[in-house]
Each structure stands twice: as structure tokens, then as C-alpha cells.
Amino acid sequence: MKKLPFLIIIIYIFLILISISSSIDYNYNNDIDNNNNNIINRNKNKNKNNLYNNKVIIKNDDNDDEINNKFKIRLDDNEDQDIYNEYHFLSKVHNRLAFNIFGSSSENSGSGSNSNSNSKNTDSSTGPTPSPISINGTLNSTATVYWSGGKSSCKSVNCTEEGFSTGDSYACSYEITPTYQRGQWEKGVKYFKDPLPKSILTSQVVGVSFVINGVVGCTPLKQELTTIEFLIQDVQVGQTISTNRSDDCSCGICYKDYEILPQSYDLLGYNKSGLNKVQLLLLDNSICATSLDIIFYYHPSTIPPTPTPTPSKPTISLLKKYLIIGFSIVGGLLIIGGCFLLIRNRYRSSGYYKPDKNDYTQIKDGKDIDIHQIKIGVRIGKGNYGEVYLGTWRGSQVAVKKLPAHNINENILKEFHREINLMKNLRHPNVIQFLGSCLIPPDICICTEYMPRGSLYSILHDQALQLQWSLLIKMMIDAAKGVIYLHNSTPVILHRDLKSHNLLVDENWKVKVADFGLSTIEQQGATMTACGTPCWTSPEVLRSQRYTEKADVYSFGIILWECATRQDPYFGIPPFQVIFAVGREGMRPPVPQNGPPKYIQLLIDCLNENPSHRPTMEQCLERLESIDSSGYSDLQYVRQQL
């Protein structure tokens, strides 16, 4: 053991000598190889840019045999000359044609005809069509927004028979009757996060294209064209789009793709770090849509080619010498430090570790916090991981959470310290305020602000309280703001244990998110109580899939259900059965019978099986703020029976 550090140092010096001897030839040969590769890549890119970027795919439903069809296409580039190119196509089983050569999109069937078999308007004119921009040599990133709420009037088999695709949900820009609602169109406005890579500048973006997954021309009594404009951040993208296509709109979940060619876009007012507003604005006629794809085209970052170097005698520069010396010194220090840590860790593991004053965590004003400075009062909470006490520190009431001695070990201390460093940097009115901590065993604790009304769970289950809908919605708005702050932090903080027990309420009924930093630690060595965390956990996480922001949205939906019913989710069902029923069989709590319709619909959307179809927390906040709760009676607590 004592000879191990010296052996590591000898090996390190040997590797440094080898690297110095080989650096000359390697750098010289590598420079020549890199230059040759640059020349080859430039030639490849040059040839690639010469390719014409138009593609035509025709598939025919009328015949399953391979029929040789002729189709003539006149390209816009040859409009001054009567030049036609003849193409041959093999027909197959599908009838979808994405036809973009003339700057418009149409759906075609048969063996090459460009007329629309579903169109009720025989006029082939589509009005002025914006000229496409060149996207040669670009990459693209896509953001997708979804519409929902439309009443389904057909099954997926109808979509297959008619050659459509089947969507999960939809909304229309019009209604048939007030009782036959066509979803939450909301003037075609949706919000999306920037899909571009963080390294891409707005100046590298050349344009945007769109794909409407839906049906167009939905007002059969109107004979005019369907006229559409696309706006991002209230700025129109490209020109007005017109089409005479008319689809069968009776079945909203059945859709086709309506593709819009790339349009120029200068990203005026575009938000690279947050949400952006997109609007599908109908000027004439109407549509039904399941989703909208927003495709950004951008030039990748390029490195200018370097001139071919003239082979010269391989030499090593003075700068390289200094770099090698510097790296050697730094590497040596790292090895010495590593050896020290190795010896200290072995010393600690043998039972001789004694923490010192440096284990205190500094609070925000730069002063140490000592557990002996806090006057511990009555116990106000208890969990599997420890106990929470009401304390008095510097004349103010605080909450002190203590870890039990039997849970304390070196790994717990490291995780505890990491989470404290995260918590002390968070400042938001709807996030519990961290005051300080102590890491000296056995007094391992954190100190936070005291919330006199306790948890939201205790309020919902207080028989003496009658809660108004306006108050419940206000508290949910507070909770949404707190979670949004965590999701937008750097790095992103995923709560992972969002439930009514972890939403604390102050004397003014303001809700603050708590226990987002310690949930992983607190579960170690703990046994879940009846109806524990699985009741708030999303189905994909119960299936051991990746935890994302949408998992927190699902947990938020369960809390919305708790507020609407003042009951425990899955009451009386053991946790292991909840895991199977929710994760594998799609079980959900029953839909509440009383409450504002917008609130109930938001609750349902948050519990969607598909994470991508759940709203974001920003959308949850926006929808909560728009709810009118007037006219709904107060919610009373009703004891649940097994």
C-alpha cells in the first residue's frame, strides 16, 4: 500500500517521456492528414451542392401491380422555355403525394394526376404561392405542437379505409353545433420550446417550413380558397398560403399531411431560451388539425479550410515545450492529490474519520450556522427519513429537518452536501427558502423557513375547512410557478417526488414547493407507507423509463385531482398493485364530477399516457390563469371508506 503512490508517479513520468518523443512526428503527420481531409471534404460538399433537390414520390391505391406510369413535370426554373422532363413511376398501395415542385402542396391519387380527388372546387388555381428558399446543405430541427379536445366521431378503421392517418386528438377552427364541440382551437395559438441546438446562432437559420397534420377546406358551403398565414412571436413567416384542397372533415382524428415549403424567416423576437408563440391564422375557410410541425433549417457551423502546408523539417515549438511542462506539473499535482485522497479515504473507512468545522455549510449571508444556536421546539412532522421540528433561530421561527443517526454514512454526507449546494442557490417566491445546514454528526440537519399552515395534503384532509374553488386554483397557480422555476434552472431540476405532501402553505395561503432536493436521499432505507409515492408517479417512470419534465407534469395532474376531490388517489389499493395497474394497465383516478370544465380538462391532459401529449408546466400555468371558477360551490371534505 505504501509503495502504490510511488509506482503511479514512475508510470506517469514514463508516459510523459514517450509523449514528448512522439509529439513531433505525430503533429507533423497529423497536420498533413487534416489538410488532405479538408480538401476532400470541400470537393464532396461542392459536388453535393450541385445536386437538384426536388423529389417526387407517387404511390397508387388503384392497383397493387407494378404499373409503369409516365408523368411529365415542368420545373419553374424553365418557365421561359417549354421544356418538360418525363419521369416513370412504379405504383404501390398508398395514395399520398407530397407535391412541392411548384411551390404548393396537394394530395393526389391515381397514376400521376395532380388533381385532388376530394376537392369540391374544380378551379385549379391556388392563388399566389410563395417562392421556396434554397435549403441545400442545411440541417433541420423540428418542434411539434398538438391540438386536443375535439369530440371523436369515428374509429381508426375509418381512417385506414379512406387513406388517412389516425391521430390521438384534434381541434377545429369552427363548430358544427354548440353541443358538438370541435376542441380547443384557441385561435390557432400554441407555444413551443426552441428545438435548435444551443450552439446554433439565429443568423445561421435560413428559413422555416410547416406540416399541418389535419384536414383543410372544412366549410363545404364556402367556395373560396382556404387561406392561411403562419406567425411566430406574432411575426408572419413567409407569405399567405392558399389552396383549393377540400377534405372530409367529419372525422377529426383522421388526417393527412399538408406540407408548406420552406419560407424565409429572420427570427424577429424569437426566444432561444424559453417559449415561443406560434399561430396558425385562418383568413378564409376553416381546418381541423391534430398537430403542427415547425421545421427550422439552418447552416451548420463550419471551419474555414486551411491552406496546404509546405512540408518542412519537423520541429517542436517553444509553445509546445511550455504546454508539455505545464501539463506535466498539473498532472503531477493531480497524482499527488489523488494519492492523498486515496490514503485519507482508506483512513476514514477504517473508522478514524472525525469531521471538522469545515463541514459547516455557509448560509446566504456568509455566516456559519450551528445547531446549538437553534432552539429546538416541538416535532411538527415525521417521515421514514427523519423528523421535522419547529425551531427558533435569531428570533425567527424556522423548520429543522434532522436525519436519524442510523442513516448517516459517508455516502449520505456527500449526497446531502451536493443537494445543499443546489438548494442554497434557489431564490423564488414559490420555492421553500433554504437558510442553512449542519453536517457534523450526529446533528445532520437543514434549516428552512417555517410554513405555519403545513402541507397542502393536510389542508385538503382537514374536515373543518370548506375550500373555495378560487382559493384552490390560486394555490395550484403558485405550485405551477414554483415547478416552472425548477425546470428553467441551470442545471434543470426535476422534482421527482411532486405530491401534495411536498407543497407547503404559509399564513397567506401562498404555496411553496419543498423537498425537491432531498427526495433521492430521503428514500434510502425507507419503506413506503400506504399509498406512497407510486400514486403520484407517471406510468413511464413506473415502467423504469427515463424521467423527464413531463413526469413532473403527470404528478401535478394527480395533485389537481386531489384538489378537485379532497381525497387520496387510489385509496385502499396497495402500492405494488398501483405500480402494475398504472404502469401496465393504464388505470387512472376517476374523473371528478364537479368543477370548472377547463380545470377538469387540464387534469385529464396532464394524465395522458403519452408524455409528449401532456402540456408543459408553462401551458398548465397559462390554462389555470384563464379558468373562471365563479358559480361553483365550495369543496367539502368527505371521508373515504374502504
Curated annotation (Swiss-Prot):
Residues 1-23 form the signal peptide. It comes from the Eukaryota. ATP binds at residues 380-388, 401. One of its GO terms (molecular function) is protein tyrosine kinase activity. Residues 344-642 are cytoplasmic. Keywords: ATP-binding, Glycoprotein, Kinase, Membrane, Nucleotide-binding, Serine/threonine-protein kinase, Signal, Transferase, Transmembrane, Transmembrane helix. It is an enzyme of class 2 (transferase). The active site is at residue 497. GO terms for cellular component: cytoplasm; membrane. One of its GO terms (biological process) is cell surface receptor signaling pathway via STAT. Residues 374-627 form the Protein kinase domain. It is a single-pass type I membrane protein. Residues 106-136 are annotated as: Disordered. It is found in: Membrane. Its EC number is 2.7.11.1. Its main location: membrane. Residues 106-128 have a biased composition (Low complexity). The chain crosses the membrane at residues 323-343. Residues 24-322 are extracellular. Glycans are attached at residues 136, 140, 158, 244, 271. PANTHER family: MIXED LINEAGE KINASE DOMAIN-LIKE PROTEIN (PTHR44329:SF298), SERINE/THREONINE-PROTEIN KINASE TNNI3K-RELATED (PTHR44329). Belongs to the protein kinase superfamily. TKL Ser/Thr protein kinase family. This is Probable serine/threonine-protein kinase drkA. It comes from Dictyostelium discoideum. The lineage of its organism: Eukaryota, Amoebozoa, Evosea, Eumycetozoa, Dictyostelia.
